[in-house]
Design a protein with these regions (language model features):
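Alpha/beta catalytic barrel-like cores
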Residues: 15-144, 153-167, 171, 175, ...
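Active-site-adjacent pocket scaffolds in enzyme catalytic domains
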Residues: 222, 237, 241-244, 252-259, ...
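Short, Lys/Arg-enriched N-terminal segments with co-localized hydrophobic residues
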Residues: 1-15
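Eukaryote-skewed repeat-based solenoidal scaffolds used as protein-protein interaction platforms
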Residues: 163-241, 247
Length: 388
């Protein structure tokens, strides 16, 4: 019995990413470093690492055989693309080995007309085999992977049918997580949803009781930019791990919350010893046209000038504001940072380069200018290799 216990413990620990690395990650889609190329060329370059999709409308116009073949082909491509994406991220420096997988791995998986396809024994067997390879790659390369079901997943809705559909959608993600070999331990994998819906924390608590063990192990809740803020999500701190979205908090409260804030300390505690993740985005540069990139935007001032919160919520292409970046990076000693931006990995790499520039300023005593310069060049070479 003791031997079995030790083996189970060892297998569980293997699922965990290394906890001592300060990571910056990006979401879902790989972008080639040279975005000046023609659209068709970029599509060809990015396709091997990018999900394919289809629509219910297209499937419903086809014969059953044609539609099922399309779903099968997409499954084959998407499972391979997810593995290639993880393998690519595994070539980056350790601090950049973090990525969110897209949610559309298996299109129409919870749709009433097509969910049957994804329960076929041959389909389940294929997914079990090939998504396991995705998880194996992540574990072998120490890539922290996660997922984020769409905003239509409203576990705290006051409409029972919406809650039922939301649970089904979350369990679809849990199936993928299970196939990848995760969900065995609290937060060996992060699957995040917003604290949305009229029922708020109480609704989330009720929904949790209906989730599978793997789903409960992986679920995280982030604070909303509208109704449900940090104080609301903290009501769930004993039930699940919390994600602090610092842009959401700024949009809702106009506050640049600090890592020393007691609320963030309680967020950290909700992870039960696992390194937390936070979400970071900034308002679009074209919305704040003319704003200095060395000054943090001030919400009360912007509102007084006629800016609308709705436009300020939208994510930027790049993390263009250096002052806001400096603030966000203050969280790095305490949590990994998931960058939510339109330019995906390219934006993430720029933020990491900004962090490196800040680190270079604080050079250890006894390190010469030439040694420091060599270190900087080596770091940059590492980033350049990762981009090719």
């Amino acid at each position: 019995v003791y031997t079995v216990f030790i083996q189970l413990l060892a297998n569980t620990e293997k699922n965990m990413f290394k906890q001592d690395i300060k990571r910056i990650g990006w979401a879902c889609k790989y972008l080639h470093p040279d975005q000046t190329q023609k659209t068709k060329i970029l599509e060809e370059l990015q396709r091997p690492l990018t999900e394919r999709a289809t629509t219910v409308a297209w499937l419903n116009r086809q014969t059953r055989d044609v539609a099922e073949q399309r779903l099968w082909d997409i499954m084959v491509h998407n499972s391979a693309a997810a593995k290639r994406l993880v393998e690519y991220v595994g070539t980056l420096i350790p601090e950049l080995r973090m990525v969110r997988l897209g949610s559309n791995q298996l299109p129409c998986a919870t749709h009433a007309d097509w969910s049957y396809f994804w329960t076929r024994s041959d389909v389940v067997a294929y997914c079990d085999t090939h998504y396991r390879k995705v998880g194996d790659a992540a574990r072998a390369l120490d890539v922290r992977i996660s997922m984020h079901p769409g905003q239509f997943v409203v576990l705290a809705s006051d409409n029972p049918e919406i809650v039922n559909r939301s649970i089904a959608e979350f369990e679809y993600h849990a199936n993928l997580i299970r196939w990848m070999g995760y969900g065995q331990k609290f937060q060996d994998f992060k699957c995040n949803v917003h604290i949305a819906g009229r029922e708020g924390p109480a609704g989330i608590k009720r929904a949790l009781q209906r989730l599978s063990t793997e789903a409960r192990n992986c679920i995280t809740i982030e604070n909303d930019e509208n109704k449900w803020g940090i104080e609301d999500s903290l009501e769930l701190s004993k039930d699940l791990a919390l994600v602090l979205d610092i842009h959401h908090h700024w949009c809702r409260e106009g506050e640049y919350i600090l890592p020393s804030d007691d609320r963030f300390k309680r967020v950290i505690d909700s992870w039960r010893g696992i390194r937390p993740a936070i979400h970071y985005s900034v308002s679009r540069a074209d919305v704040l046209d003319g704003h200095s990139d060395s000054v943090r935007p001030n919400m009360p001032t912007l509102l007084a000038q006629g800016y609308k919160k709705g436009k300020l919520r939208a994510h930027s292409d790049f993390m263009w504001n250096h002052a806001v970046n400096d603030w966000a990076l203050e969280f790095s000693p305490h949590a990994d940072i998931m960058v939510e931006s339109k330019m995906k990995n390219l934006s993430c790499e720029r933020l990491h380069e900004h962090a490196q520039q800040k680190t270079k300023v604080a050079r250890p005593t006894g390190v010469s200018n030439s040694d420091a310069g060599m270190h900087v060049r080596n770091v940059r070479r590492g980033c350049i290799r990762a981009k090719t």
